[in-house]
Amino acid sequence: MNNAMIRGMGWVSESSRGYPGQVLCSKESHGLPRISGKEILDRPHKAFGRMDPFSKIGFAAITFALADAGIARSKSKKNIAVIASSVTGCLETDITYQATLSREKGILPSPTLFAYTLPSCFLGEASIYHGLTGESFMVEEEIPDGLQGLSLGLDLLGDGGCDALVCGLCNSNINGVGPINTTCPEPGALFFVFEKQGSRPGHGIITENRVQNIFSLGNKKINSLTDLGKNILVKKTN
Amino acid sequence: MTQVYIAEAATITSLGDDLDTLYQGLVQGKSGLTHMSDPGLPGHLESAPPRFDTSVYTSPWAGLIPNLIPKELSLNNPAPLIFSLADRLLSKLGPIDPSTCLITASTKAGIDLLPTITRNTALLPKGLLVSSLPGYISQKLGLARPGFNISAACSSSTIALAKGAAMIKSGRETAVLVCAMDVVSEFIFSGFSTLGAMSPDPAAPFDKNRKGLTLGEGAAAMLLMNKKELNTAKKTGKRTHLTQISGWGVASDASHLTAPARDGLGLKLAIQEACQKADISFSDIQAINTHGTGTRHNDEMELTVLRDLFNPTIMANSIKGAIGHTLGAAGAIEAALCIKLLETRILPGTPGFIEPAPGAQNIISSRPRPFGKGPVLTMNSGFGGTNAALILSGVAP
C-alpha cells in the first residue's frame, strides 16, 4: 500500500487555470490560453518567454501546484522529484520545428525551438526556476490516465528518494493536426504536489493498493489524475 | 533485500548486431561512424542507404546501423524506422513471459515520419508519437500490458533501467524488460547542427581538441529479474545470470536547460545515491563508463565530477567516438557493455582521444586497460539538467 498527502494542485485547461481558491477563467473562446510570465512568476524570467506552448502550460501548472502547496521558490535547492505523463508529447512543437526545417531547407532552423522538441525540457525549466534537484522524467504512454507515472512517483516518495513529488499530466492540442489511432487526451496540464503524511494540511490522502492496482482518495476510487483533480475540487466546493 | 539481476542483454549498434561484436570492436579500436555523403571517404557504409543530404549541416558523420530500412505497416502506410530497429532488437531476445513489465526509452522514436504529415495532415500515422513505441513492442512480444516509455533526453534509458530496478526491488514487479532505441533522423541531426553541438570530424571525447558530438543510432534490451524469477528461468534453461544492477541514482542540476552544471551537482547527487543503494563507497568502483559526448561542457563537467569524487587512479572511458551518441539508447547500450566489462575486466579505450583535455590524463586512455575486481559505474546526463547513474556488479561464475 502506497499513500501520500496531496499538498497542492495546479492546472491549465482550455476553460481555466490556477489552483484551488485562485482560479482564472479563460478569455479565449477556444484552445489553450496564452499565459504570460507576469501571471505566474514572482519576478521576470526570460526563459519563460522562450518556451514553446507545451512547455509553458506544463511549467505554469507545476508553478501553480507548488504555490498551492506553499512551497516557495528559494535559493536553496530542494530534493523534489517531477514526473509528467503524456500521450501526445510536444507534437505541436515538433510540427512547428519541422515546418521551419522544411521551409529553410535545413539551413536555419531555430536552436531554441529544437531544444523544446524534447518533451521533458519543461521539467528541466521547472527544476531550474524552482530549484528542484530530484528525479525528473516523462512517462509517455497511450493510456491517458497518468496513473503509471503516479505509481512510479509514489514508490519514489515512499522509498525516501525525494522529499516531495510533483506529478501530473501534460498534453498538446493535437486536434488541429488530425485524428490519430490512439485515445486523444484533453489538451492541457494538471499537476499535484505529494508529500509523505505529516501535520501540514492538504487536499486529502491518495492511496494506492498495489495488489489490486487501485487508487483512491478517501473512500472514492480514482480512475485518472483528471478524476483526482475533479474530486478535489468537488470536495472543496462542498 | 531483493537483488536485481540482468538475465539477458542485447544490443544493436553501428558496430554490429550483438553485444560481443560491439565489445570486441571497441577493444580492437574499430569505428562504426559513417561519412554520410562521401562514399570515397573511409568509414562510408555502402550498405547504409542515404538518409538525407548533410551538406547544409555542420557534420557529415553519424553512427548508422547497416541495412536498417523502414518497412510498411500496410500498403502506402509507412512505419517509422524505429519499428524496424525494434523488430531487429526483439529478434535477438529469448521468449519473454507475458506478465513481464515493459519500459521503453526513446527521445523521439518515430519522428522520421513527421515530414509525411506536414505535407498531408489527414491522418497522423501510427508510430509518430513516442507513446506508441511501447504498445508496438508489447504487441510484438504478446505482453499482457502495453508498457510505457521514459523520456528524459540522453538519460532516458539509464532512468528506465533505474525505474525497472526500483520496481523489482520494491516487489512491484518480478521481471521488467527495458527496450531502448533511437535512430538518426534529419529532424534530430538538424537540431544538433543548429545548436552548434556537432563535431565536423568524428567525436573525440575528452580530447583537448574535441569539437563536439557525433550522432549515432542504436538499441539495447535488458531483461531484469528478481532472484526467484531468475532461478525459474535458469531451471528451464532460458536465461543465465549475467550481472546485477546494485545501485542507481537520478538527479537534476537545476542549473541550465542545454548545458550541464559546471560543478556537476546533479551527476554527483546521482552517483552518491547509486553508491548508497549499492552500499559501497566511491573508492570501491573500479571502472567508469562516462557519458563522454565530446562536447566541451559535458566532458569538462564529467572530469570535474571524476576528480572530485574518485581517486586519481580511477579509469574511465567513452564509447561515443566509435558508435556516436545514440541519445535515448545510449544509457542502456553502455549499461549492457558494462556486463562485458565485468566479464573481461578490460575497459575499452576512448576512440578519438589523442591529446588529453585538462584533467583527463591517466583517467582516460585511447587503449584498452585491465581493471581490478569490483563494481563498475555508468553514467549519463542530458538536456534539462537530467543525470543518472547505475552501478553494476557481481558476475556469476
What is each stretch, according to the model?
Chain B
Residues 172-194, 199-203, 210, 248-262, ...:
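Acyl-CoA/ACP chain-elongation machinery
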Residues 8, 26, 86, 102, ...:
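Conserved small-residue
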Residues 2-13, 19-20, 24-38, 43-46, ...:
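Condensing-enzyme catalytic core mediating Claisen C-C bond formation in acyl metabolism
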Residues 141, 148-180, 215-237, 326-347, ...:
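Active-site-proximal alpha-helical scaffold in enzymes
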Residues 81-95, 160, 270-278, 309, ...:
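Stable alpha-helical structural segments in soluble proteins, enriched in small hydrophobic residues
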Residues 35-80, 106-163, 172, 188-190, ...:
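Conserved catalytic cysteine-centered active-site region
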Residues 1-7, 374-375, 387, 394-395:
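Extreme N-terminal starter segment of soluble prokaryotic enzymes
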Residues 103-106, 151, 176-182, 224, ...:
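Short beta-strand segments
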